[in-house]
A protein has these predicted regions:
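Intrinsically disordered, low-complexity segments enriched in polar/charged residues with Gly/Pro
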Residues: 10, 51-54, 128-130
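Non-cytosolic coordination micro-motifs
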Residues: 20-47, 82-196
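Long, hydrophobic N-terminal alpha-helical segment
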Residues: 30-43, 47-71
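Mid-chain, structured segments of secreted extracytoplasmic proteins
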Residues: 56-102
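Sec-dependent N-terminal signal peptides
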Residues: 4-17
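Compositionally biased, low-complexity repeat tracts
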Residues: 16-19, 23, 58, 68, ...
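Generic marker of residues within folded, mature protein domains
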Residues: 9-11, 66, 133
């Protein structure tokens, strides 16, 4: 019911007032997106485009956005540069914390997930990065839009940030990903699923 109330409220607020992350906003078409980027968006597949927004964060090297003809821009994912780190994940956790602070200031309290699989071999603190690389540890933070914070979220319904490695055998460097889902993401992904 809460989600329906949020959808109802946002439906009557003009989308153009929402200035989203990296200077991007919900519903942008490809022309508008190109104007907000340093280069033309590069098509990948299935509504996904690789972009370099003019307003980018220095930690992030790459950005992938989901844009459809029907919904415009509906999802953003940023990927950081590789961060050299110890087996304990000290450096990547520090960078993660640096990102959490401004996000918490803007969007409020988050739900942090630091979950280790019960059946993993990598239980010691010195195995922190091995557990991340193996997929046995989830280290993320999540925000979700509610009736109380709908204006603060500026057209977003969810924000998530986490730590991963590029491959299971890499445990001395990691990257941070961040994802923003706009209100129209539900329709965007549903439309994408309809063609499968």
């Amino acid at each position: 019911m809460k989600k329906l109330c949020i959808l109802f409220i946002l439906f009557f607020i003009p989308v153009t007032i929402f200035a989203g992350p990296f200077g991007l906003r919900m519903g942008m078409n490809l022309e508008e997106l190109a104007e907000a980027c340093t280069e033309e968006p590069e098509y990948i597949a299935d509504d996904r485009y690789y972009i370099q927004p003019k307003k980018s964060h220095p930690l992030f090297d790459g950005y992938v956005v989901w844009v459809s003809e029907a919904n415009g821009l509906y999802y953003i994912k940023g990927i950081s540069r590789e961060i050299k780190t110890t087996d304990y994940g000290t450096e990547v956790k520090q960078e993660f914390s640096k990102l959490l602070s401004p996000l918490e200031k803007k969007y409020g309290k988050f739900k942090k997930i630091d979950k280790l699989s019960e059946d993993t071999l990598w239980k010691d603190s010195g195995d922190w990065m091995r557990a991340i690389a193996d997929g046995a540890r989830i280290y993320e933070a999540h925000w979700e839009s509610t009736e109380e914070n709908v204006e603060t979220f500026e057209g977003l319904i969810s924000i998530a940030i986490g730590i991963k490695t590029r491959a299971t055998y890499i445990n001395n460097e990691a990257y941070i990903w961040i994802e923003y889902g706009f209100l129209n993401a539900i329709d965007g992904f549903n439309n994408l699923d309809d063609v499968l």
